[in-house]
């Protein structure tokens, strides 16, 4: 969960966010190395006799270097990116499917694998919050899923564009009216994870939070029974 004055990414709570952080660190390292090399060459060229060389002189080694180097950098950036994109999109034998539908300005969740459960999830007003509950993030009815098992979330919208997002899990998918988008969702631990609609969708866009609770499997099965 984010906190005040936070400069870093949120702690990874699932395999998708771990991939996102790895890719971020990988690209950041390449960027720092490129910056150092370019700075070194710039300082060298402006402070040594290299600046007095004939600019029309052909230097085949340099031409080869500034052709091959960018290609290698792009390859080193692209390969991890493609891997991460694949893992973020592919769903492997999900234990459960949940449909999330965006409305102005709340979410509806529907469970249909062997059960028929549907409920709306509204933000709790500040004056009604319990002590310790996060402001503008807590809802009256959380989405619940089993921890440690992959869940498929199918996302759509009823009226305008929305976006279903939980930063600590590294997931963000657009909710488009008339279209179904899916994403794999898994957590590495039990807990409550918060997000918000990340697509401007009207006057109350800022008051459309997402709260997902990951519980042990036996607790989740008990919750399913209680909701029927």
UniProtKB/Swiss-Prot annotation:
GO terms for molecular function: copper ion binding; cytochrome-c oxidase activity. GO terms for cellular component: mitochondrial inner membrane; respiratory chain complex IV. Cu cation A2 binds at residues 197, 199, 201, 205. Residues 46-59 are mitochondrial matrix. Cu cation A1 binds at residues 162, 197, 201, 208. It is a multi-pass membrane protein. Mg(2+) binds at residue 199. InterPro entries: CcO_II, CcO_II-like_C, CcO_II_C, Copper_CuA, Cupredoxin, Cyt_c_oxidase_su2, Cyt_c_oxidase_su2_TM_dom, Cyt_c_oxidase_su2_TM_sf. Its EC number is 7.1.1.9. It catalyses: 4 Fe(II)-[cytochrome c] + O2 + 8 H(+)(in) = 4 Fe(III)-[cytochrome c] + 2 H2O + 4 H(+)(out). PROSITE patterns: COX2, COX2_CUA, COX2_TM. SUPFAM superfamilies: Cupredoxins, Cytochrome c oxidase subunit II-like, transmembrane region. One of its GO terms (biological process) is ATP synthesis coupled electron transport. Gene3D superfamilies: 1.10.287.90, Cupredoxins - blue copper proteins. Residues 1-14, 88-228 are mitochondrial intermembrane. It is found in: Mitochondrion inner membrane. NCBIfam families: CoxB (TIGR02866). Component of the cytochrome c oxidase, the last enzyme in the mitochondrial electron transport chain which drives oxidative phosphorylation. The respiratory chain contains 3 multisubunit complexes succinate dehydrogenase (complex II, CII), ubiquinol-cytochrome c oxidoreductase (cytochrome b-c1 complex, complex III, CIII) and cytochrome c oxidase (complex IV, CIV), that cooperate to transfer electrons derived from NADH and succinate to molecular oxygen, creating an electrochemical gradient over the inner membrane that drives transmembrane transport and the ATP synthase. This is Cytochrome c oxidase subunit 2.
């Amino acid at each position: 969960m984010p906190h005040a004055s936070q400069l870093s990414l949120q702690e990874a709570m699932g395999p998708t966010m771990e991939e996102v952080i790895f890719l971020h660190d990988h690209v950041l390292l390449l960027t720092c190395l490129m910056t150092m090399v370019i700075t070194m060459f710039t300082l060298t060229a402006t402070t040594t006799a290299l600046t007095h060389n004939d600019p029309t002189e052909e230097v085949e080694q340099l031409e080869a270097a500034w052709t091959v180097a960018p290609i290698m950098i792009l390859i080193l950036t692209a390969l991890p990116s493609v891997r991460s994109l694949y893992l973020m999109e592919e769903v492997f034998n999900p234990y459960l499917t949940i449909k999330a539908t965006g409305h102005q300005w709340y979410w509806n969740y529907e469970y249909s694998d062997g059960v028929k459960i549907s409920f709306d999830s509204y933000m709790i007003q500040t004056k009604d919050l319990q002590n310790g509950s996060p402001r503008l993030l807590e809802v009256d009815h959380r989405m619940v899923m089993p921890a440690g098992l992959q869940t498929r979330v199918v996302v759509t919208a009823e009226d305008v564009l929305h976006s279903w997002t939980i930063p600590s899990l590294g997931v963000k998918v657009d909710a488009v009216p008339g279209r179904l988008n899916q994403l794999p969702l898994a957590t590495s631990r039990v807990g409550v994870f918060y997000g918000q609609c990340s697509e401007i969708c009207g006057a109350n866009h800022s008051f459309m939070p997402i709260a997902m609770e990951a519980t042990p499997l036996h607790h989740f099965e008990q919750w399913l029974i209680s909701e029927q």
